[in-house]
From Swiss-Prot:
This is Phosphatidylglycerol--prolipoprotein diacylglyceryl transferase. Belongs to the Lgt family. Keywords: Cell membrane, Membrane, Transferase, Transmembrane, Transmembrane helix. It is a multi-pass membrane protein. Catalyzes the transfer of the diacylglyceryl group from phosphatidylglycerol to the sulfhydryl group of the N-terminal cysteine of a prolipoprotein, the first step in the formation of mature lipoproteins. It is found in: Cell membrane. GO terms for molecular function: phosphatidylglycerol-prolipoprotein diacylglyceryl transferase activity. The chain crosses the membrane at residues 15-35, 55-75, 90-110, 117-137, 180-200, 238-258. One of its GO terms (cellular component) is plasma membrane. Its EC number is 2.5.1.145. Disulfide bonds: none annotated. Pathway: Protein modification; lipoprotein biosynthesis (diacylglyceryl transfer).
Length: 287
């Protein structure tokens, strides 16, 4: 039986003329949880919580800006003939996670250089929190009925009906047609990556490997899920941008892992350089 219940209202709360959307609440919750977990892990590894908070203060807005630039660049035809301010109308939708990651990585490189800390250590600390935030954030797409796949077959519908709760079936049924809940596929995949990264940390891998594993595993999932989506950005009208970027990230990350395993001695649990210097000084004083 086709699900025809009314979809979830995108507006969670209305206070006078002010509307607060579920999308914003979900994204904010994911971001706050990610920041909290990253700060706790930084503290455990000997970095100050203030350092991570300072990084987040720069990384979050820059990541959002890059996410928008990335989207506008590949959808420029939408904005070329329209009013110029539409380029900045982020509230109307149009951001891309790959753009956000690029912005975050650039911020981390510059931040690490200025604050004299290891870029790879920051990246390793942030990676599990980032993928968890992405897993949560996809539920914002669910409420908005966006970033979904194409229509499903009757056989797939019957299979989904046995396992998926009604609220997902209802929300993914748009104008009488049910679509692939690609938000759910990616959210579940991201949670599995999160668990995998937590397990990887326990084995004290080479510094940078947690982040690079995040980059590889997320890109693998994104490559296949992107093939189902109906709202993909395209390069030259024939190549799905996210799939091309995913392949590029996988190749580069594998090369980095191989290179760093041969040339780098620092491990995930090693104290940051500043702490090592302090420990050496304290040892000399004791002598």
């Amino acid at each position: 039986m086709l699900h025809t219940a009314a979809p979830i209202d995108r507006v969670a709360i209305e206070i006078g003329p002010l509307s607060i959307y579920w999308y914003g609440i979900i994204i904010a919750f994911g971001a706050i949880l990610a920041i909290y977990l990253a700060s706790k892990e930084a503290d455990r590894l000997g970095l100050t919580k203030d350092l991570m908070l300072d990084f987040v203060m720069f990384a979050v807005p820059i990541a959002i800006i890059f996410a928008r630039i990335y989207y506008v660049f590949f959808e420029f035809d939408q904005y070329a003939n329209g009013p110029w301010w539409k380029v900045f109308a982020i509230w109307e939708g149009g951001i891309a996670i790959h753009g956000a990651v690029i912005g975050g990585v650039i911020t981390a490189i510059v931040f690490a250089k200025v604050r004299k800390v290891s870029f790879w250590q920051i990246a390793d600390i942030v990676a599990p929190s980032l993928i968890l935030g992405q897993a949560i954030g996809r539920w914002g797409n669910f409420v908005n009925q966006e970033a979904h796949g194409g229509p499903i077959s009757q056989a797939t519908y019957e299979s989904f009906h046995q396992y998926l709760p009604d609220f997902i079936m209802n929300q993914m049924t748009i104008n009488g047609v049910m679509y692939h809940p690609t938000f759910l596929y990616e959210s579940v995949w991201n949670i599995l990556i999160f668990v995998g990264l937590l397990l990887l940390r326990k084995y004290n891998p080479v510094r940078g490997e947690v982040f690079l594993t995040y980059a590889i595993t997320y890109s693998i999932g994104r490559y296949f899920i992107e093939g189902l989506r109906t709202d993909s950005l395209y390069m030259f009208d024939i190549i799905r941008t996210a799939q091309f970027i995913s392949i590029l990230i996988i190749i580069v990350s594998i090369i980095f892992i191989i290179y760093r395993r041969k040339t780098v001695s620092e491990r995930y649990l090693d104290a940051p350089p500043s702490n090592k210097k302090k420990n050496k000084k304290s040892t000399k004083k004791k002598k």
